[in-house]
């Protein structure tokens, strides 16, 4: 792990979107707001994303692609980039984690880790 790997901090807030969910059809919609903070000394551009999404039944799906929400932001040192997206699960509980493929101002490619976070309907867990 290089210093660049630890120069990006990822914070996550999740929300269950009850009005767009349909539990009787096993469809649970969650939004997640991601804040990507550049703690390093160089600007870093987010080029790719790789998500691993697992529901409570152990079913896993992967999402890979360029950028996030149609953007490939460059995050200056000591600044942050925030976006909101969503996912649909077949269960009221799930976990997401993954990586962002980043490139530093000097052209070095590195991975920013997105630590596992929980998606859960309110009142499901105590």
Swiss-Prot record:
Q: Which domain of life is it from?
A: Bacteria
InterPro entries listed in its UniProt record: ApaG_domain, ApaG_sf, Uncharacterised_ApaG
What Pfam families does the record point to? DUF525 (PF04379)
Could you tell me which PROSITE patterns the record lists for this protein? APAG
Q: Spell out the Gene3D superfamilies in the cross-references.
A: ApaG domain
The Gene Ontology biological process annotation of the record reads:
error-free translesion synthesis
What positions does the domain ApaG occupy? 2-126
Q: Which PANTHER family match?
A: F-BOX ONLY PROTEIN 3 (PTHR14289), POLYMERASE DELTA-INTERACTING PROTEIN 2 (PTHR14289:SF16)
The record's listing under NCBIfam families reads: PRK05461.1
Question: Can you name this protein?
Answer: Protein ApaG
Q: Please report the organism this UniProt entry assigns to the protein.
A: Shewanella baltica (strain OS155 / ATCC BAA-1091)
Gene giving rise to this polypeptide: apaG
């Amino acid at each position: 792990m290089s210093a660049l790997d630890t120069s990006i901090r990822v914070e996550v807030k999740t929300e269950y979107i009850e009005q767009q969910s349909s539990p009787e059809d096993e469809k649970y919609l969650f939004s997640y707001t991601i804040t990507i903070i550049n703690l390093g000394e160089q600007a870093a551009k987010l080029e790719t994303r790789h998500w691993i999404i697992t529901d409570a039944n152990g079913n896993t799906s992967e999402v890979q692609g360029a950028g996030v929400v149609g953007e490939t932001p460059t995050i200056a040192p000591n600044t942050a980039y925030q976006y909101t997206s969503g996912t649909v699960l077949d269960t009221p509980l799930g976990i997401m984690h993954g990586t962002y493929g980043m490139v530093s101002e000097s052209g070095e490619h590195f991975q920013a880790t997105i630590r596992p976070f929980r998606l859960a309907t309110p009142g499901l867990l105590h």
